[in-house]
Amino acid sequence: MMIVFHVCSYKKLQRYVKTGGIMPPVRAWENIEQAERMSKSTGRRIILRLKFPGDAPKLEGHFNQARVLNTRYDLGCI
């Protein structure tokens, strides 16, 4: 398992809570600094700390520091 950081808006967070998960593709940053940079540049203020499998593929580009999960990510509690 690895800890990653998913950046989203408040509106998206509400959808995640309503549906109980994040629909694929689920993109996340490997470190908080990149997530904060993304948050500031896009205006998305929410950063979620998620656990991805250790073998989650790297996302092309993105400074080689982003991962993607091509399955639904179920949220336990927020």
What is each PLM-predicted segment?
Residues 1-2, 10-13, 19-78:
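Conserved NAD+-utilizing ADP-ribose enzyme module
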